[in-house]
Design a protein with these regions (language model features):
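Active-site lumenal/periplasmic loops and adjacent helix-entry segments of GT-C-fold
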Residues: 15-113, 117
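Start-transfer (signal-anchor) and selected internal transmembrane alpha helices
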Residues: 1-19
């Protein structure tokens, strides 16, 4: 019975990321794309772990990755290294985050409230 509800949940979440399936950038702030590009640039220059966003802060650079979690950018970098553009890797990262958070919330609610959740 849980598989049926899980599939219903996944079908209901499709409209959530329908704008992300179109070409180009959808309406959002572009700092995720900028940070993914800076993370890609930092790794391509041979820095590990990546800490410095060289083009941030009006070109002076900022230690963005010291203070902001790097995990989403590592996941996006997997898609980037597989040959996708930066915009597409950010979109896939967002879609993956939406789907995984919905599935995790489903199982968490099920654990607390049983079949009512």
């Amino acid at each position: 019975m849980s598989k049926k509800y899980l599939w219903v949940l996944l079908i209901l979440i499709l409209p959530t990321f329908s704008l992300m399936l179109k070409n180009g950038i959808y309406t959002m702030h572009d700092f995720h794309i900028f940070r993914q590009q800076q993370f890609d640039k930092c790794l391509s220059q041979g820095y590990f772990p990546c800490r410095w966003a060289a083009d941030a802060g009006l070109g002076y650079g900022e230690p963005v990755f010291n203070f902001y979690g790097q995990f989403p950018y590592w996941v996006g970098q997997i898609f980037r290294e597989s040959g996708l553009q930066i915009i597409d890797s950010v979109k896939i990262n967002f879609i993956l985050t939406l789907v995984l958070s919905a599935v995790a919330m489903f199982f968490l609610a099920r654990r607390f409230w049983g079949n009512l959740g």
